[in-house]
């Protein structure tokens, strides 16, 4: 069972964007950072374990040549082997900051030359893979940035061309030294998934076709791809082959966020039906097939959810954001 803990107030509310919550745990400092997007700004908050807000500040998208301020599409902390960077994407470009958000170390402007006059230009979908940070774009390309151990000498090292539709989300997991391992998956507005092997050069391993609905959120855990779709379903695929093992009718409306507690294999799903569910993923020791068990369901009444994240790697607490909701709601197990 989970209970509603003390909420963390926001200055505004959360924009109606999928995956609109990022969480960074800082156990050494007994702090948790939260990041939420609202229009042209991103709100960064730090809170003590009891949910007591300690600090709050705003980041704004870098101005371009346009008349109106650019809208932010996502904010996400990327945990690299040697540093943590905060990445902010917008309709203008990609901004990278030190983890506290005070120092910008890199700016990449989006090239709108290939876009048609009626096509929106934006970046969306952020994940760290080794010493790389991968960011999706409106064109379907994934930009791969090589991150140094310190300093601002960040380099765009590669562009991955597996998609024809805008990227929605990217998920990664450590490769753990295995050969030919599938350690990154990208999703797009058509529901297509591309599975990659990271490295000095990223390699496309397989494509998992869509079926007419977008895939707003995707996660990867021990070779299992969890994909949340616009029809409320969660699909579990074998990453190396792309084979579908499990199909869950998880929500009555579109899924807006997935997250994984990596230590225990718990999957968090949030949908526009106001529900949050927790699932336990595992493999049958004899057949190797993927299995799933429903652990918990929570209704956040009268709220269009748009973000959900575990607050710890063991899945004992989670937080959610909602459109027009001026707080981050926290839940913990009892």
UniProtKB/Swiss-Prot annotation:
WD repeat boundaries on the chain:
162-206, 208-247, 250-289
Its function?
Plays a role in the adhesion and fusion of the sperm-oocyte membrane through its interactions with IZUMO1 and IZUMO1R/JUNO. When cross-linked to form dimers and trimers, it has a regulatory effect on ERK signaling pathway activity in response to EGF stimulation. Colocalizes with the EGF receptor in WDR54-specific vesicle where it sustains the internalization and controls the degradation of the EGF receptor after EGF stimulation.
The record's note on its domains: WD6 repeat is required for cross-linking by TGM2.
Tissue distribution is: Expressed in epithelial cells (at protein level). Isoform 3 expression is highly increased in colorectal cancer cells.
Keyword Cell membrane part of the UniProt annotation: yes
Q: Which GO terms describe its molecular function?
A: protein homodimerization activity
Q: What name is this protein filed under?
A: WD repeat-containing protein 54
Outcome of substituting residue 221 to A? Decreases cross-linking
Keywords associated with the record:
Cell membrane, Cytoplasm, Fertilization, Membrane, Repeat, Ubl conjugation, WD repeat
Altering residue 107 to A: what's the impact?
Decreases cross-linking
